[in-house]
Amino acid sequence: MPTAFSRRSLLAAGLSLGLLAAGSAQAADWCASKPVKFAGVNWESGMLLTELMGFVLQHGYDCKVDSIPGNSITLEQALANDDIQVFAEEWIGRSEAWNKAAAAGKVVGVGAPIEGATEGWYVPRYLVEGEGAKAPNLKTIADLGQYAELFRDPEEPGKGRFYNCPAGWTCELENTQMLQSYGLSDKYTNFRPGTGPALDAAIVSATKRKQPILTYYWSPTPLLGRVDMVQLKPRDGEAKRIQVQAGLSKAFHDGAPELVAVLSRVNVPIELLNRTLAEQAEAKQDAPTTAKALLKAHPELWQAWVTDAAARNKIQAAL
């Protein structure tokens, strides 16, 4: 016959098992009736995080996962409408679409999949430092008005060329506003490459030939691990605090708490992320292949995200 202590222990154990069962049921309830749709973003770190999260939900929790392509603004609007459920790499506060949806209670940011992210306007280091530097006094964005000739646009030789983000990215709108606020719109063309890889190709081509180039860029990325670039300083008070979270639809956030708890724990150290992205680019691998290899090589990552023993076993078996 159990003692009072053992009865309490059994009761506590029963409650714990009940909570675990309830959590599993919550995940099963969502995934039994509908898929988890991810934003099909088109930049490297976002694609990798999408695959990491999707792999864990698919193999650990038997979810059907899908990725819906589109540009950032369209996908954030889809998130607000619960047409998709997860935006794996949401730069919080950057997008008006996100800000409006968050204020209306339609989206929720959780976790910190990336910490230490950066962004800004960059030039090659050889342009501003070292022997033969053509612009040793170029330090800030405000200085650029004096250097339009250095960054001459081959299609409009009377202006310099600024390489913006592809059209449809949130940063494209912000950079356009910055060109105007710094009085650079009349001195530089606002060149928008068609895709992220096209922007990378322009930077790599210029730096291989030691040519001047002025571009927006960000980290984590494989490119900044391979090309030595210097970030130009913005005006005082304009440096941005970057917070990256997993963006969730409110319906998913409220309807699948166990899955949300997993996504809120997803984090890849930025040094490992940059190194992995560089290796992916070098090997010409796709994001699903890289994600699986990363999870296999670093079980300490996903084991910190997934606390359920049964889910862990299924993920391990899938690797």
What are these regions (language model features)?
Residues 50, 68-106, 202, 222-228:
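Pocket-flanking alpha-helical
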Residues 25-38, 151-159, 303-305, 319:
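Immediate post-signal peptide segment of exported/extracytoplasmic ligand-binding proteins
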Residues 44-63, 177-180:
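Short, polar/charged alpha-helical segment
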Residues 78, 84-88, 164-234:
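Ligand-binding pocket segment of bilobal, Venus flytrap-like solute-binding proteins
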Residues 107-163:
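A conserved helix-loop-strand patch within extracytoplasmic ligand-binding domains
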Residues 30-45, 63-68, 159-163, 263:
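Short, well-ordered beta-strand elements
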Residues 120-132, 242-256, 279:
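A bilobed periplasmic-binding-protein/Venus flytrap-type ligand-binding module shared by bacterial periplasmic
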Residues 45, 169-189, 194-200, 204-208, ...:
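An extracytoplasmic/periplasmic, membrane-proximal ligand-sensing/linker region
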